[in-house]
């Protein structure tokens, strides 16, 4: 049993297969999904991982949670959930970022979310009741649920009676949904069909509990490598090299300018006696005349 992930519902679209068929899919995005903490048998009595996703503002996170995130050396998370794992082998290191390659195409998953809220709904919309007749004595009770209970015996309304009330916004799990495709570069998971919840709502994605784990699935999970963006890591070194080259060129230019200035100041000093000599001769000639 592997850990699950926390994803955000982006919306629905369709993907075309090689044979020309188009499949309706739900797009789920992994937003900085990281392992926040571990649960071990020695300390907690079971093995599990706490996973966090999203980026939260500091004002929206309580101080104990901020300290826990700082201890784990991860950013502030908007959503945190716990997933049971199979033994110590199923644990991932704290701070590890889970990739979309955690699931493979063709795999079946279970997705948990909160259904869309409908507000206060009547019995016909909430439970599918047929309502009362349009005529024959029915005046203002066309969409009512009809009888509520019995008479003096039992003298009460049974629990669970289907009546009007709040509809939707319930936690539901949809099982055995097929993963059509994954996009690890953008952190997207495409799941066939619909999933419970509205856009921008959080979903918990797990391996299907009623089906065996397919071959080729990474265990204990697919982690984003920190050294993957090699070009970005080499960029500061390249920038420093460029700065050093520019500094060296500026130093060479300054040295050339200083040498030129020295030569310019030294040349007139040598020519001054030659220039002054004729002037002295002219003055002497004037005196003699």
UniProtKB/Swiss-Prot annotation:
The modification N5-methylglutamine is found at residue 152. Pfam families: Ribosomal_L3. The keyword Glycoprotein does not apply. Keywords: Methylation, Ribonucleoprotein, Ribosomal protein, RNA-binding, rRNA-binding. InterPro entries: Ribosomal_uL3, Ribosomal_uL3_bac/org-type, Ribosomal_uL3_CS, Transl_B-barrel_sf. Residues 230-289 are annotated as: Disordered. Signal peptide: none annotated. GO terms for molecular function: rRNA binding; structural constituent of ribosome. Part of the 50S ribosomal subunit. Forms a cluster with proteins L14 and L19. PANTHER family: 50S RIBOSOMAL PROTEIN L3, LARGE RIBOSOMAL SUBUNIT PROTEIN UL3C. This is Large ribosomal subunit protein uL3. The lineage of its organism: Bacteria, Pseudomonadati, Pseudomonadota, Alphaproteobacteria, Sphingomonadales. The gene is rplC.
